[in-house]
């Protein structure tokens, strides 16, 4: 992996790009997007050559009232298929599953029954064991899997080191994400953290993703 590193001007075809407009934007409007907007966004991502499109969350309907949120809070299989059909395109479909807020055994079917390609597991530093369990379950179901550790700007150095070691060594996730949840990290901090993540990820044959804020 080290030979693939570059700088801001390097050509990096190995880097994959994910559009999170629906999932992240839905936090602002309670996921009340029209089907027309979602379809247009999907087609724009396909035309632009985007690698992944994240549709929203796999939220537990026992915790969140479906009457209070749009459909992309829950990402039912039939709703995604109404937009993408069989998704006969190079674009891959992603959903996010929050630790403690997703009923994985009820709401995440085997990949053979779903048009979704990737599940991104969102966790905080204090729920790493549950994140490992969810990541391994989703991997066993046939999905590509990431684990995103939220709010790392508030985590201590030692607990972050332990969390990364546990995730990298015990989870079946292919990717571990560096997430700046609050937009509070400066470039030099991101570089230092990225080096930390990459060092541990490479040790266990995993890759690193980043979700930044402006």
Where are these regions (language model features)?
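Active-site beta->alpha loop and helix N-cap motifs at the rims of alpha/beta catalytic domains
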Residues: 46, 52, 57-166
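N-terminal small/glycine-rich loop or linker at the start of catalytic domains
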Residues: 4-30, 90, 114, 144-150, ...
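Catalytic alpha/beta core domains of metabolic enzymes, predominantly
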Residues: 179-214
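Short amphipathic alpha-helices and their capping/turn segments at secondary-structure boundaries
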Residues: 1-9, 38-47, 164-165
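Glycine-rich anion/phosphate-binding loops
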Residues: 30-40, 123-130
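Conserved C-terminal portion of the radical SAM core fold
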Residues: 163-181, 203-204
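Active-site glycine- and acidic-residue-rich loops that bind
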Residues: 32-35, 149-159, 184-188, 211-214
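Conserved, mostly hydrophobic/aromatic
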Residues: 25, 45, 119, 176
């Amino acid at each position: 992996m080290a030979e693939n590193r570059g700088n801001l001007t390097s050509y990096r075809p190995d880097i994959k790009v994910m559009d999170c407009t629906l999932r992240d934007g839905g936090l602002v409007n309670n996921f009340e997007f029209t089907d027309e907007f979602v379809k247009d966004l999907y087609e724009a991502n396909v035309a632009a050559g985007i690698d992944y499109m994240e549709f929203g969350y796999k939220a537990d309907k026992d915790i969140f009232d479906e009457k209070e949120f749009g459909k992309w809070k829950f990402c039912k299989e039939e709703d995604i298929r109404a937009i993408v059909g069989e998704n006969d395109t190079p674009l891959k479909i992603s959903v996010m599953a929050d630790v403690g807020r997703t009923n994985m055994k009820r709401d995440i079917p085997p990949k053979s029954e779903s048009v979704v390609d990737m599940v991104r597991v969102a966790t905080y530093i204090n729920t790493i064991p549950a994140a490992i369990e969810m990541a391994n379950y989703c991997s066993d179901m046939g999905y590509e899997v990431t684990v995103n550790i939220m709010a790392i700007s508030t985590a201590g150095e030692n607990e972050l080191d332990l969390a990364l070691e546990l995730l990298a060594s015990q989870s079946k996730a292919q990717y571990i994400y560096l997430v700046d949840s609050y937009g509070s990290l400066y470039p030099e901090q991101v570089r230092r953290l990225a080096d930390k993540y990459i060092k541990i990820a490479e040790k266990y044959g995993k890759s690193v993703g980043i979700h930044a804020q402006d």
